[in-house]
Amino acid sequence: MYAVLKSFGLKGLNGFPVEVEADISGGMPALSIVGLPDSAVRESGDRVHAALKNLGFKWPDRRITINLAPADVRKTGPVYDLPLLLAVLAASGQLEPPPKDMAFLGELALDGSLRPVSGVLPMALEAAAGGVRALYVPAENAAEAAEACGSEMQVYPAATARQVVDALRGIQPILPTMPVPFDPADAWNHVPDFADVCGQPLARRAMVIAAAGGHNVLLVGAPGTGKSMLARRLPGILPPLTREEAVETTKIYSIAGQMPAGRGLVTARPFRSPHHSASSAALAGGGALFRPGECSLANCGVLFLDELPEFSRESLEVLRQPLEDGCITVSRAAGSATYPSRFQLVAAMNPCKCGYYGHPTRACTCSPSAVRQYRSRVSGPLLDRIDLCVEMDPVAFDELHTSTPAESSADLRKQVLAARAVQARRYAAPGYEGVRCNAQLTAGQVRRVCRMTPAAERLLRASYDTLGLSARAHDRILRVARTVADLAGKQLLDEEALLEALQYRAQEKVETF
């Protein structure tokens, strides 16, 4: 006898349909799984065998062949356990074959209960696009899968395979899970407040500019000056995630297996802070099963690299593609996968190995050559992709004990949202497809958007000649100046905006001492 069910697999960031075929024929009792399965899929036969018996069903003592189509695409993970069990039941006559517009996902425990699987959202989105009307998933994955529900598809949660069988037989229907209304407003409540940061007015201003324009930041200062404090508070003044960004971010976290059980969409902008010992593979992603790395897990959020020169050169060079293209491609012998990596980079470093070069009260123990060698670990091409560089001085005693409250994240966020609203209106016009903030402007778009006053143009010309700026540095300064002008509500770039942008140049601050 023969039966076929619909399921789904993962390829990169997207799902793809898989037909689970079961054929029971005469011969010696045996189970064969074909269709390019990995070891986890091959082991599913033992799980299905035990689950069937523990649920009170009969295991066919005949030759069973399972085919996972298409056969030329590798199938990974335990997601096919549930459809495999149902296919065996249908092929052995213990269950009527389910309709073709039903699909099934889920890992089996030996007692027949269902365990959550990774990558449910991209598979559910593919199911909805492919005309599936009923998707059965483990109960812990239901909230995530329900975010793919449209006017046609319903998501049905099940704690055990027995519940699915009873629902298909019409004995005990399962109530569908409804999607939770998307509300990212409360995400800010879980981020530390900028009011906790004492002093550092220049660095605080740089973080506002970075948030308003989507710019990358480098913080340089001695230990204890507040570099990490500022970085961890940046997500609290960024605009809320749009639903499109939330879906993309949730897909990444779901594939990586980092979605909390029972959670729907990710509503907070990610903040990732890998240790400086992280390898290039940890940042880029990959592995035998193609999992997203830190660059992709920070998508639509902040990637914070503390102690930047301590990262290996190989790891830092991984950042160049995502910073330039907004995505990262991982290639292995088994194939390649491309993941979105549109993150905002915040890097922090000490001015030297001991950390106290230029400190007003503590002596530096590094020689000039040691300082030069330490700073040279950060390559020029990487510095060329950082828009804002801030040198942070030690916090004075009076700043720690002032009675004047510092601006809170809520106050700074109002400035950022106002500037982002200006940019949203500007880039809604034709010719700015894919541009959401000033940092994403191409060289040609910079010329159109960054119109200057005559005095500002003379200042930029003089700076270009005097400082020996490159074309990329020229455009970077204009992007930052455009953000400064947006924060001030100005149409044209004036001298004040350009001077503020010029003071944040990263290349010279790191390479000179």
Tell me the role of every PLM-derived stretch:
Residues 208, 265, 270, 280-303, ...:
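Conserved alpha-helical scaffold flanking the Walker A/P-loop in AAA+ ATPase domains
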Residues 1-218, 222, 228, 331, ...:
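Peripheral, non-AAA+ core regions of ATP-driven protein-machinery
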Residues 40-45, 58-60, 67-77, 289-290, ...:
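Basic, amphipathic alpha-helical bundle interface domains used for macromolecular binding and assembly
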Residues 245-279, 286-287, 393, 433-444, ...:
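Conserved inter-motif catalytic segment of the P-loop NTP-binding fold
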Residues 300, 306-307, 318:
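Walker B catalytic acidic pair
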Residues 111, 305-312, 355:
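Catalytic P-loop NTPase motifs of RecA-like helicase/translocase cores
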Residues 219-260:
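Walker A/P-loop
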